[in-house]
Design a protein with these regions (language model features):
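Structured mid-to-C-terminal alpha-helical surface segments
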Residues: 1-157
């Protein structure tokens, strides 16, 4: 396992670790990004990650849901139609469309402002609605989305 730089465009680049696990001949890659300097609004949350083959879980500190969504929204706002990260669109759709997932709108708003401020992209906020319209109507974005759907079986579920 070797770390690679990630988020190099930020003032506080992070590291990405790619782990490869094997079980009965099956190989699975797991990518873990570690970064510093992100605005977590209001704070990190404790997350228990249940292990698949043991009766225990790992405790990790993670972004709260609103900060996770804010980072994805900020990326969409900033990159607009040059965004090729379809996973962000999919994640937003899944996280906001599932019953039982509670999103605090006020916290999301504060997290979005904090993320935009940290990334120095607040100047793009007034045009965000028109950026979304451009993304939605852009034929190249639609082609990239269709390819993402075809390449990832889980999208169709």
């Amino acid at each position: 396992m070797l770390p690679h730089k990630c988020m190099e465009e930020h003032d506080y680049p992070g590291l990405r670790f790619t782990l490869i696990g094997t079980l009965d001949g099956l190989r699975q890659k797991v990518k873990i990004d570690i970064s510093t300097g992100d605005a977590i609004t209001p704070q990190a949350v404790e997350y228990r990650y249940p292990l698949m083959f043991e009766d225990r879980s790992l405790q990790i500190m993670s972004y709260n849901l609103e900060t996770l969504l804010a980072e994805k929204l900020e990326n969409i706002m900033y990159r607009g139609t040059s965004n090729t990260r379809m996973r962000d669109f999919y994640d937003i759709y899944m996280l906001t469309g599932k019953p039982g997932i509670a999103i605090n709108d006020a916290t999301l708003y504060r997290a979005f402002l904090a993320t935009s401020n940290t990334r120095r992209t607040t100047e793009f906020i007034p045009q965000f609605a028109s950026t979304l319209e451009s993304v939605e109507s852009n034929t190249e974005m639609q082609k990239i989305w269709n390819k993402f759907c075809n390449d990832n079986d889980y999208v169709l579920e």
